[in-house]
Structures are given as structure tokens and as C-alpha cells.
Amino acid sequence: KTKKSFSADLGVEENEILNLKDGDELILVRASQQRGLEMAREMERYDLAALALIVKAVNDIAAQGGYFVSFADQIICGEGAADEVAKFRHYLAAAAGKAHAVYMASSSVDVTTSIFTDGVLAAGVGLGIKRNGYAKKEPTEGDSIIGICTSSTAGIGIDIYSKVILEDMRNGVNDYIEELDEIAGEAMITPPPNYANLIQKLYDSFDVKDIIPISKLGLVPDIAAVTGGEDKIKIQPSDWEYPKIIKLMQKEANLTDDFIIKHFNAGIGLAIIVDEKVELPILLELNEMGVEAYSIGKIIK
């Protein structure tokens, strides 16, 4: 393919492809959400679960300093996944103009797990190009943690949502919940926002130490996985407002703030670790961009 047609397929600017350099790294990520997919099957809304997985892959790649490559803006399942990954190597080589120069450790990469016998997909797969020369910085005591707000659950804690909203409150997945102004199942598996452009802008414009998509275990454990332990961070949940679905959970199940920040995303889609000195300029810039963001915590050791 020509660079122009390739860039159109990827949804990226042509100059980004022209900037590929020797030493750029490929990133492969997989985002699984088995419970969400089961719920999607019951709702006949596979598109919601699929999109959630795609966007998780996009955000993970962007947070690693990479450009998302969208051959994988589809969900790939079963044996076909390895073939798609192998194909990607050749597309990337054509884009770089060096057909011999793109190396992948294996031509056959097992990237998905099929969880349904009827062929319904199990994982979102993303391949990206890591920007040459980008390096994250180690968080240090006193650094600030900025949170970007979201109304999406990101699929975190979905079993707890199911227990409270479906079982305890006796709702079906397709039932309308007045407090949420939404269908129960849709509220639980709403896809997270695509943060790729915002992440790139933050990396390019500010001295950001790390950016963490809150999309795996919960707000505190996802940040702790990067900082080296929960004892190294202090999150202040009173500093921002939870989305409607978490407020409903808190009311119905009498959940504490400490439980919420450990088992859900708590309404935070991205956590940004920065030096305390640049916290205010970043918050002001985000506010000007129309992005709801708050100082949510500190690195304490």
C-alpha cells in the first residue's frame, strides 16, 4: 500500500508514518472483559462490549507513548488473531518504506482467548508504534496525581455492579433505571472515552512522569501497579464527584469511599503523575480544553 492509503486505513496523519524511525518499537496489548461480554450477549449488544475492548487497547498504547494502529480497531478472536498480527508486520514495513526492516519476535502470536463456542470475541487487540526516544520518569515523593473524570465504568468491578444493580435491586439487564436515566446493562458496560489524542497532547506539552488508564482493577490498584505499591500513594476521594452509577451503588450497598476507590474506577478514566510544580498549569490547560480534571492525590513515599 502507499503511505497515503495506509495512513487513511490507520486513521493517522501521513506525516506520523513518515516519521517512523529505526529503533521504534511495536506495542501489542490485549484487553479482556469476559463478564461484560457475557452481559452483552444477554443484551444482544456486542457492539458495546467490543468498543470497550478496542478503546482500552487504544488508551493502553497511547499511555505507553505509542500511536494506535487501527488494523486492530476490530475485535479478533480465535485462530485468526495470529494471522492478523503477522499481516500487520507487512503493512508496517510498507509504511516505513523498508520491507525488510520490521522485526517481530514471532510470526505467529497468540493474542486472544475464545470464551464462547459460537465464535463471539473475547479480547480487544491493539498494535501500535512506540515513539522513538520516549522515556517515562520514576514518581517521587510529593508528586501530584491528576484525575481525568469519566462516567464510564470501564468494566471494572462489573461483578459487584451485577450483584447490587441486577440481583439486589431486582433489575434485568434491559431494564430502565430512573436514577441513571439509562438501561441497566448499558450503564455497566459503557465504553471508556478514547484518550489517545489527549494523552499525546499531555506528553508533548508538559513534563508528565506517567499516564495510567484506569481500566483494569480499580483506581488505587491501577495507580499502585505503576508506583510500586498502595502504601506509596494517597488518594482523596472527596475532591471530585462520583458518576451516577457509583452514587447509586454507594447508596444501595452502603459502600465506603475506601472500597470504591479500590474496586472501581471511581469515575476516573486517566491518572496523570506530574511534578507538583506543573500540576496547576496542567489543570488550567485541561480546563481550557473542556476536560474535567482534578487533583486527586499525592505520591507519599
Residues of each region from the PLM?
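Helix-biased detector of long, well-ordered alpha-helical tracts
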Residues: 1-301
